[in-house]
C-alpha cells in the first residue's frame, strides 16, 4: 500500500447548526454530526483502510469525530495524538457570534473580507495564512515523516486547518484555497510518494460544504 493519509473534517457541531463563528470555542457534535462521523468511518471501512495512528486537534468536536470514526473501524485502541496546532482558525472577536449578527455589526463586506481573504485576520483572531503557519510546520515535523515511514495516518480536524493541508498537498494558490470548502464528515484519501507528493486523491463522500 502506498503512503496513506486520510483527512476528515469533524461532523456538524452545535454551533455549525446555529450558524455561529466557532473557532477555538468548544461545542460538541449534533446528532447529525455524530451520524456524519459514523458515515465517514463506514466509508473508510468499505475501502478496506486501517490506520496506525490518528491525529486530532485539542477541540472536542474533532476528538469526538476521530473517536467515532475509529470505533466504526474497530480501531479504538490505536495511538491518538491531540495537538492544538490542528485547531480550527481562531475567529477572535467573531467567535460565538451568529454570522448574520456579525454582518449587522461590521457590515457584510468587512465580514466577507475576514472570512474569505487569505491574510486579513478578524479582530483578535487568525487569518487563513496564520492558521497555515501553525498547521504546516506541525504536519511537516510530526505527521508527514510517519506517513513516509509507511504508517497509515488519519487526521480528524477542522475546515480551515484542513484547508491549509490541502493547499499544500494539492499545491493550490491563495485564490484557489479561498474557493475551497471542505464538507463535514467527508473523508479525503491521499496516497503519497516517498517525497510527500500526491500520487492519488479520492473523496469518499460527496457532501455539501457549509
From Swiss-Prot:
Molecular function (Gene Ontology), one example: phosphoglycerate mutase activity
Pathways involved: Carbohydrate degradation; glycolysis; pyruvate from D-glyceraldehyde 3-phosphate: step 3/5
Pfam families: His_Phos_1 (PF00300)
Complexes and interactors: Homodimer.
Annotated site (Transition state stabilizer): 158
UniProt feature coiled coil, ranges: none
Alphabetical list of HAMAP family matching this protein: PGAM_GpmA
Native source organism of the sequence: Parvibaculum lavamentivorans (strain DS-1 / DSM 13023 / NCIMB 13966)
Keywords attached to this entry: Gluconeogenesis, Glycolysis, Isomerase
Annotated InterPro entries: His_Pase_superF_clade-1, His_PPase_superfam, PG/BPGM_mutase_AS, Phosphogly_mut1
Catalytic activity: (2R)-2-phosphoglycerate = (2R)-3-phosphoglycerate
Family designation: Belongs to the phosphoglycerate mutase family. BPG-dependent PGAM subfamily.
Catalytic residue positions: 10 (tele-phosphohistidine intermediate), 88 (proton donor/acceptor)
Listed name of the protein: 2,3-bisphosphoglycerate-dependent phosphoglycerate mutase
A GO BP entry: gluconeogenesis
Enzyme category, top tier: isomerase
Binding site for substrate: 9-16, 22-23, 61, 88-91, 99, 115-116, 159-160
Function: Catalyzes the interconversion of 2-phosphoglycerate and 3-phosphoglycerate.
